[in-house]
C-alpha cells in the first residue's frame, strides 16, 4: 500500500532528474535532504552500423523513460505534483545534444561515444601540433572526450545534421529543456566540452574557429542553482508534473555529487568509487597541469574549479573478479543473506597488507594527454595456495585501486600545491569497510565515509532548493545536509608497506605499457586518436 503523505501543500519536496550512463532516475527529496522515493529505468545507447565507436543517445525513447521515472517517483511518494517545489537535472558529462533552429533536438551522443578518433588525430596537428595544448590551457580538457572532434565528425560525415545545428547543450540541459522549453548550459557540465574558459566560466568561441567549426551554436551559460524556466503545459501532460513548477539549472554528475558530499571548500578532496573511480580536489582558482596528466573542471560552486583524475574500470574490475571466479562465494552470500563483496572482504581481511606481493595491472594513473592502459593481468603470483588464492587476489585489487588513487592525488598535489589532510570516500566502493581502511592506509589520509554514498541526486536537489530560495547557497547547504557514517584513520605500519608496494607497482606498470606499445598485448582502454 502506498505511504500516505501528510504534507499536501505545495513546496514540501524537491525532484532531481539524474541521467547516468546506464540509467535515468527521478528522485524525490524532502527539505531535510532525505530521499523519499525514486523511479528508475535502464537505457541503452545505440551503436550505429558501420560507424565504429559510435554510441548515439536515443532522444525520443529516453525522454519517454525519463517521464516514466517521474510518474513512478510521484506514485511511490504518494504526493501530488503540486508538492514539488522545484525540479533540477544532472547527467553524465561529455554527452551532447544538437538542436535545430526550431528548438527541436535532432541528434545526440552519450559520453562513451568514440567515433571521432580520426578527427582527434586531425585536430592535434593544428597550429603546429599545439591545438590540444591550447584547448587544455583554456578549458582544462584534452580532445579525447571533448565536443570539438564530435562536431568535426558531424561536419565530415553528417553535414545534414551539422548544417541544421542551431544550438548544442549537454544531456542534463536537454532534460531541463524538455521540461521547460528553455535552452541553456551550466559551467560544470559544459566545461567537459573543451570549449569553456575556466576563468570566465563562459564559452571560448575562438577554439571552434581555430578548428574551422561554426561558433554560432553555443547556448547561453547559466550557473547551477539559478532559475531556467518553468514546467510547460506540454511537459506537464507528458510526465504528470505541475505546469508552472520552477525548473532550476543543474549540472555535471561528479560536481553535483561533490556538492551532496559537502566537498565545497578549497583543498577538500574526494574519491568517488564507482565503475570508474574519480579523485577530485577543489582548487581555489583555475590552474592547469603543465604535464596535462589530469583534467580540470568547473565546480558547481562559482569561481571554484576541481582537478579530476580518473581510474579506469575499477568497480567493473571488481565485478568481473566476483562473477568470473567467485561463484561459490556468491552462493554462500546469498544463503547468508549478505552481499558477496562483504563476504570477500571478510576473507581478504585475513590477508596481510601487501597481498603477498601480488600486483594487479589494470588501470594506470591518469595521463590525460596520452591516455591508455596496459593489458589487464596479475603480476608476481605464487603457486602456494596458502598465499595466492581468491582472498589474496581480491585484497590485491582493493589495494591497487587505492594505490592508483594515491598516485593520482600525488600528481594533483605536484602541480597545484594543494595537499589534502583528509578525504571523503563515496560511491559503491565506500560500502566496503576494508576498502575504506585500505584507502586510508595507502594514502596516509583520514577517510570520511558519508551516510548517503550516492550523492549526485542529493546535490541536484540542493541546486533545485537554492534556485527557489528554500536554502541560501549551494556550499552552505551541502555542508549542512551531509551526514557521516564512519571515519578511518591511517595505520602508519601499513602505510610504510604500501609505500614500497606503490613504488614497485609503478615500475612494473611502465614495463607493461611497453608491451602494449610493442603490439604484444592489448590495452585495457585507449583514448580516441591514439
UniProtKB/Swiss-Prot annotation:
GO terms for molecular function: autoinducer-2 kinase activity. NCBIfam families: PRK10939.1 (NF008187). It catalyses: (S)-4,5-dihydroxypentane-2,3-dione + ATP = (2S)-2-hydroxy-3,4-dioxopentyl phosphate + ADP + H(+). This is Autoinducer-2 kinase. It comes from Salmonella typhi. One of its GO terms (cellular component) is cytoplasm. Belongs to the FGGY kinase family. Its EC number is 2.7.1.189. It is found in: Cytoplasm. The keyword Kinase applies. GO terms for biological process: carbohydrate metabolic process; quorum sensing. InterPro entries: AI-2_kinase, ATPase_NBD, Carb_kinase_FGGY, FGGY_C, FGGY_Carb_Kinase, FGGY_N. Keywords: Cytoplasm, Kinase, Transferase. It is an enzyme of class 2 (transferase). It comes from the Bacteria.
Amino acid at each position: 500500500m502506498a505511504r500516505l503523505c501528510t504534507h499536501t501543500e505545495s513546496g514540501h519536496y524537491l525532484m532531481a532528474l539524474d541521467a547516468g550512463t546506464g540509467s535515468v532516475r527521478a528522485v524525490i527529496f524532502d527539505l531535510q535532504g532525505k530521499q523519499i522515493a525514486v523511479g528508475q529505468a535502464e537505457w541503452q545507447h545505440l551503436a550505429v552500423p558501420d560507424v565504429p565507436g559510435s554510441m548515439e543517445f536515443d532522444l525520443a525513447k529516453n525522454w519517454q523513460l525519463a517521464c516514466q521515472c517521474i510518474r513512478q517517483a510521484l506514485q511511490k511518494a504518494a504526493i501530488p505534483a503540486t508538492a514539488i517545489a522545484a525540479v533540477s537535472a544532472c547527467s553524465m558529462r561529455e554527452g551532447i545534444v544538437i538542436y535545430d533552429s526550431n528548438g527541436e533536438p535532432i541528434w545526440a551522443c552519450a559520453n562513451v561515444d568514440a567515433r571521432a578518433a580520426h578527427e582527434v588525430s586531425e585536430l592535434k596537428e593544428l597550429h603546429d601540433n599545439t591545438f590540444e595544448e591550447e584547448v587544455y590551457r583554456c578549458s582544462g580538457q584534452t580532445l579525447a572526450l571533448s565536443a570539438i572532434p564530435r562536431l568535426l565528425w558531424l561536419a565530415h560525415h553528417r553535414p545534414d545534421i551539422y548544417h541544421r545545428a542551431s544550438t548544442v547543450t549537454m544531456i542534463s540541459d536537454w532534460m531541463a529543456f524538455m521540461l521547460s522549453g528553455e535552452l541553456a548550459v551550466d559551467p560544470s557540465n559544459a566545461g567537459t566540452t573543451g570549449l569553456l574558459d575556466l576563468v570566465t566560466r563562459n564559452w571560448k568561441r575562438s577554439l571552434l574557429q581555430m578548428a574551422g567549426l561554426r561558433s554560432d551554436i553555443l547556448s547561453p551559460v547559466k550557473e547551477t542553482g539559478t532559475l531556467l524556466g518553468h514546467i510547460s503545459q506540454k511537459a506537464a501532460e507528458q510526465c504528470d508534473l505541475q505546469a508552472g513548477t520552477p525548473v532550476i539549472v543543474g549540472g555535471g554528475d561528479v560536481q553535483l555529487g561533490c556538492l551532496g558530499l559537502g566537498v565545497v571548500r578549497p583543498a577538500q578532496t574526494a574519491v568517488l568509487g564507482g565503475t570508474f573511480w574519480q579523485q577530485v580536489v577543489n582548487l581555489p582558482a583555475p590552474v592547469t597541469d603543465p604535464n596535462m596528466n589530469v583534467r580540470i573542471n568547473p565546480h558547481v560552486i562559482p569561481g571554484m574549479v576541481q582537478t579530476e583524475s580518473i581510474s579506469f574500470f575499477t568497480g567493473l574490475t571488481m565485478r568481473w573478479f566476483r562473477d568470473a571466479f567467485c561463484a561459490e562465494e556468491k552462493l554462500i552470500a546469498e544463503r547468508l543473506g549478505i552481499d558477496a563483496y562483504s563476504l570477500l572482504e571478510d576473507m581478504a581481511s585475513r590477508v596481510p597488507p601487501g597481498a603477498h606481493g601480488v600486483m594487479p595491472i589494470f588501470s594506470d594513473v591518469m595521463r590525460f594527454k596520452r591516455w591508455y592502459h596496459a593489458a589487464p593481468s596479475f603480476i608476481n603470483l605464487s603457486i602456494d595456495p596458502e598465499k595466492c588464492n581468491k582472498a589474496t587476489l581480491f585484497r590485491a585489487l582493493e589495494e591497487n585501486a587505492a594505490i592508483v588513487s594515491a598516485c593520482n592525488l600525488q600528481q594533483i598535489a605536484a602541480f597545484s600545491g594543494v595537499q589534502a589532510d583528509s578525504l571523503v570516500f563515496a560511491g559503491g566502493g565506500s560500502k566496503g569497510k576494508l576498502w575504506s581502511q585500505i584507502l586510508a592506509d595507502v594514502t596516509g589520509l583520514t577517510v570520511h565515509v558519508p551516510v548517503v554514498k550516492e550523492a549526485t541526486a542529493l546535490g541536484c536537489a540542493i541546486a533545485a532548493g537554492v534556485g527557489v530560495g528554500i536554502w541560501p547557497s549551494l556550499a552552505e547547504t551541502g555542508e549542512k545536509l551531509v551526514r557521516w557514517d564512519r571515519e578511518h584513520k591511517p595505520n602508519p605500519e601499513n602505510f610504510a608497506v604500501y609505500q614500497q608496494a606503490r613504488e614497485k607497482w609503478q615500475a612494473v606498470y611502465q614495463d607493461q605499457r611497453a608491451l602494449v606499445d610493442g603490439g604484444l598485448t592489448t590495452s585495457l582502454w585507449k583514448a580516441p586518436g591514439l
